[in-house]
Amino acid sequence: MTLDPNVAARLKRNAEGLFTAVVQERGSGDVLMVAWMDDDALDRTLKTREATYYSRSRGEQWVKGATSGHTQHVHSVRLDCDGDTVLLTVDQVGGACHTGDHTCFDATVLL
């Protein structure tokens, strides 16, 4: 797969070629998680509507829910004004967090 050159030209990546993905639940508006993407992960996400991310620790792409069954069906992808973050709007099946929680932001409230 190859990311559309017009989209690729707008992206601002870090030194590792990655950019941030913020994931929001379509129905509730809850922020579910933040992850990393590379061009190929974004391209796969756009073409399949399966949320695909890049794992820095494993050095590879991963499709959300491929092993856990906690999938994300992508309804929209938006690029922010700086080009360094995308916002995915998804239908979440199961927990979005690796802990099994619905969102990665269910923990301690700081303020």
Curated annotation (Swiss-Prot):
Q: Which SUPFAM superfamilies does the UniProt entry name for this protein?
A: HisI-like
Q: Where in the cell is it found?
A: Cytoplasm
Query: Which enzyme type, at the first EC level?
Result: hydrolase
Q: What cellular component terms from Gene Ontology apply here? A: cytoplasm
Superkingdom classification of source: Bacteria
Metabolic or biological pathway, per its Swiss-Prot or TrEMBL entry = Amino-acid biosynthesis; L-histidine biosynthesis; L-histidine from 5-phospho-alpha-D-ribose 1-diphosphate: step 3/9
What catalytic activity does the UniProt entry give for this protein?
1-(5-phospho-beta-D-ribosyl)-5'-AMP + H2O = 1-(5-phospho-beta-D-ribosyl)-5-[(5-phospho-beta-D-ribosylamino)methylideneamino]imidazole-4-carboxamide
A Pfam family of the record is PRA-CH
Name any cofactors this protein relies on: Mg(2+); Zn(2+)
Q: Give the cofactor note text.
A: Binds 1 Mg(2+) ion per subunit.
Where does the chain bind Mg(2+)?
80, 82, 84
Q: Which residues form a coiled coil?
A: none
Q: Tell me which Gene Ontology terms the entry assigns under biological process.
A: L-histidine biosynthetic process
User: Can you tell me which residues bind Zn(2+)?
Assistant: 81, 97, 104
Known EC number: 3.5.4.19
What UniProt keywords are attached to this protein's entry? Amino-acid biosynthesis, Cytoplasm, Histidine biosynthesis, Hydrolase, Magnesium, Metal-binding, Zinc
Q: Which GO terms describe its molecular function?
A: magnesium ion binding; phosphoribosyl-AMP cyclohydrolase activity; zinc ion binding
Q: What does this protein do?
A: Catalyzes the hydrolysis of the adenine ring of phosphoribosyl-AMP.
Give the multimer and partner information: Homodimer.
Assigned protein family: Belongs to the PRA-CH family.
What this protein is called in its record is Phosphoribosyl-AMP cyclohydrolase
Organism of origin? Mycobacterium marinum (strain ATCC BAA-535 / M)
Gene name tied to this protein: hisI
